[in-house]
């Protein structure tokens, strides 16, 4: 069997969840598991996050899968509902819903009170990111309309920060949110991963960790390890062939690499069809038998190349870490000009997944 494997470490997930609790000891934790748990597999990771106070998902189907698997804590649809049928299903299964636009609000008002169990709602403010949510001048009226709906059990308040991971920080958005909601007595959820780590003033009643649960960094240029995080995914394969190049020999499609001296090259069973970034350049970090080295040439559909000139023991069958413990996913992402989030979410269905811990 082809060796390309993603191993999910439940112990690392538990560790990272505990770190969130240490950072925000007064807050409940809504573990964000959208996008199939950032590519790790929703029902694979759920046991490692079972002590979370709730789960944030994108699609109703994800919430129903968690309910069917026996998870009884709060489930929150982060984009809300898109039809009256979805609203009814959310009510039936005790799923909380974000409301971020007038159309969703109107659906709540149109739902007959006797037909569903009351639903917990998170009302989203657009405090400056300009993606989802009611602008500040419309926010109070939206709250009043929701609270007048018989199908609404309770309302929490939320917003999302655009630059919690950057030098600009959250001050402007936090000021906007606090000014509008001053004197209100509702549970509040503000902090994403970066804000959990950097801005304790935003922790409030609920925090919403995402990428940090999976052991990657939300802050460019700052390692996950420096925050005490552990990688939840180890993406591995093996060497399936070795070639020795002479000076002047080219390597792979497009001749992206030309040897300037004798070079030993490992051919690794992993390519862009497995989720490795095709645009990763020469020099992207990779580990062979636990030793860090670098890629060479262009990534192809099923294979990539690694320099083993300084690893005389490396040969066919040697173990390869694409990212994980020796090579953080953020290091590969930085070399490829992207973010760890994208790489984790892009691991392909043909990769074998295993669970440990």
From Swiss-Prot:
- Per UniProt, what is one Pfam family of this protein? Ala_racemase_C
Q: Which GO terms describe its molecular function?
A: alanine racemase activity; pyridoxal phosphate binding
Q: Which keywords are on file for this protein? A: Isomerase, Pyridoxal phosphate
Cofactors that this protein relies on: pyridoxal 5'-phosphate
Is the keyword Nucleotidyltransferase assigned to this protein?
A: no
Disulphide-bridged cysteine pairs: none
- Put simply, this protein is called Alanine racemase
Originating gene: alr
Q: Which GO terms describe its cellular component?
A: cytosol
What family is reported? Belongs to the alanine racemase family.
Reactions that this protein is recorded to catalyse: L-alanine = D-alanine
